[in-house]
Design a protein with these regions (language model features):
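Glycine-rich phosphate/ribose-binding loops and adjacent secondary-structure elements
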Residues: 197
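Catalytic-core "active-site belt" of small-molecule-metabolizing enzymes
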Residues: 1-194
Length: 197
């Protein structure tokens, strides 16, 4: 599965699904294929993205919880960067809250609280995600293939770290995307399942 996705990734093309002989059939198999893709990429991992973080997105992906994709160092772009036409197959952008950890959060059986995670967070910055897919059907290919496709991850354009973000009311914080001076999309932090934290 990872070989098919990696080949399409490098050619910036889509495929009509992962070949049946190696197509993941469950979320676990999808994440295993994603891990194999990360290993095959041979690039340093910079972080992770969450997908399907709103009820509408969960409906599109036919899931009831967010999923994870991997971001590589080459995926991170600085404020003002551009992505060339032909650099992705999916022409979309999403406004994001990005959190950069300042301490490790080791795996454990018990879920971490928001306060525990925020205590391990050093910075928050606005960002624009430029997702991409190597699957011609995109989300309709099913969550197992989407996970194998790195959760539709590709680029993340990072803004500057925000001073005083811990004191901000992030759920109520307005968010807007503008193109050529026109607002094309707007919402708030609450669009992220009630709270982007």
């Amino acid at each position: 599965a990872s070989a098919a996705i990696l080949a399409a990734w490098r050619r910036v093309e889509t495929i009509d699904g992962i070949p049946q002989a190696c197509r993941p059939a469950s979320e676990d198999e999808g994440y295993q294929a994603q891990d194999a893709l990360v290993a095959a990429m041979g690039e340093p991992v910079a972080g992770y993205k969450l997908g399907a973080t709103s009820p509408g997105a969960q409906e599109i992906f036919s899931v009831d919880k967010p999923f994870v994709g991997t971001l590589f160092e080459s995926s991170l772009l600085q404020n003002g960067a551009t992505v060339a036409k032909g650099g992705v197959t999916l022409y979309a952008v999403e406004a994001e809250f990005v959190f950069r950890f300042s301490a490790d959060i080791p795996a454990r059986a018990e879920a971490y609280s928001v306060d525990e995670v925020m205590a391990a967070t050093g910075q928050m910055m606005p960002a624009i995600e430029v997702p991409d897919t190597r699957l011609s059907e995109g989300p309709k290919a099913g969550i197992a293939q989407v996970l194998a496709d790195d959760g539709l991850a590709r680029y993340l354009v990072l803004g500057s770290p925000v001073e005083g973000w811990r004191d901000a009311d992030l759920p109520e914080h307005p968010v807007a995307i503008r193109a050529n001076g026109e607002t094309v999309s707007e919402g708030s932090g609450a669009n992220e399942l009630g709270d982007p934290r």
